Amino acid sequence: KILLSYIGVVLFLTGCGVYSFTGVAITAETISIKNFYNDADGGPPDMAQTFTNQLTDYFQRNTNLTQVEEKGELQIEGVVTNYRLTPVAPTATGTDDVGDAAALTRLTITVSVSYVNTTDENFSFENKTFSFFEDFDNELNITAIEADLLTRIFDQIILDIFNATVANW
């Protein structure tokens, strides 16, 4: 009876492993993230640098990869290709002489990314597009809320890039 209990405990413990909630099982040890550049019309002048910094910080916080300037086992580079403000959620003004107005404006950011995985080329990709948007009240001044909007949009795009590269989702 003690032997059966011992075998049960051993089987239970061997079933327990170290699991990652991000799904990251990385064999590489180094990563190089080149500075993204801005090819979008509009947006703040430091938008691409801000994106690069947030991306680098995210990989630092969520992996054990050592960041190197170039020739990492994993390599990421890209460009911010689109910064677009679009009116959404039209509302009627109630007068004939004034056209309908938008209650919300949508800020959309698009990034094109190339990724090289030197440990397994099957995971590499070139010029993959990642995009996300945030809507905001049309009454608000974009310059007053732009930094916050960019942070939230970048957070989602970076999560998508992370999942497409090292998390393999």
Show the residue positions of the predicted features.
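Sec-dependent bacterial lipoprotein signal peptides
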Residues: 1-16
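A structural "domain/chain start" motif
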Residues: 14-60, 64, 69-72, 119, ...
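Short coil-to-beta-strand
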Residues: 29, 125-130
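Second-shell loop/turn segments in exported
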Residues: 38-45, 140-150
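Compositionally biased, intrinsically disordered linkers/stalks adjacent to structured regions
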Residues: 48, 146-169
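Surface-exposed short loop/turn segments
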Residues: 61-63, 76-124, 132-144
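A short coil-to-beta-strand element that immediately follows conserved catalytic motifs
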Residues: 69-75, 125-127
